[in-house]
Amino acid sequence: YCQKWMWTCDSKRKCCEDMVCQLWCKKRL
């Protein structure tokens, strides 16, 4: 289970299932 404020973007969690978090993750990095 994942929430917007929980997004970790790990290659193992694939950014919280189907949520579009890749873009957000890239920004964070």
From Swiss-Prot:
It is found in: Secreted. Changing Q22R: 100-fold increase in inhibitory potency on human Nav1.7/SCN9A. Expressed by the venom gland. Changing Q22E: 9-fold decrease in inhibitory potency on human Nav1.7/SCN9A. The keyword Chloroplast does not apply. It comes from the Eukaryota. Keywords: Disulfide bond, Ion channel impairing toxin, Knottin, Neurotoxin, Potassium channel impairing toxin, Secreted, Toxin, Voltage-gated potassium channel impairing toxin, Voltage-gated sodium channel impairing toxin. The keyword Disulfide bond applies. Disulfide bonds join C2-C16, C9-C21, C15-C25. GO terms for cellular component: extracellular region. One of its GO terms (molecular function) is potassium channel regulator activity. The presence of a 'disulfide through disulfide knot' structurally defines this protein as a knottin. Inhibits voltage-gated sodium channels Nav1.1/SCN1A (IC(50)=630 nM), Nav1.2/SCN2A (IC(50)=230 nM), Nav1.3/SCN3A (IC(50)=770 nM), Nav1.4/SCN4A (IC(50)=1290 nM), Nav1.6/SCN8A (IC(50)=630 nM), Nav1.7/SCN9A (IC(50)=15.3-1000 nM) and potassium channels Kv11.1/KCNH2 (IC(50)=4.2 uM). Belongs to the neurotoxin 30 (phrixotoxin) family. Negative results: does not inhibit sodium channels Nav1.5/SCN5A (IC(50)=22 uM) and potassium channels Kv11.2/KCNH6, Kv11.3/KCNH7, Kv1.1/KCNA1 and Kv1.4/KCNA4 (IC(50)>200 uM). This is Beta-theraphotoxin-Gr1a. It comes from Grammostola rosea (Chilean rose tarantula). The lineage of its organism: Eukaryota, Metazoa, Ecdysozoa, Arthropoda, Chelicerata.
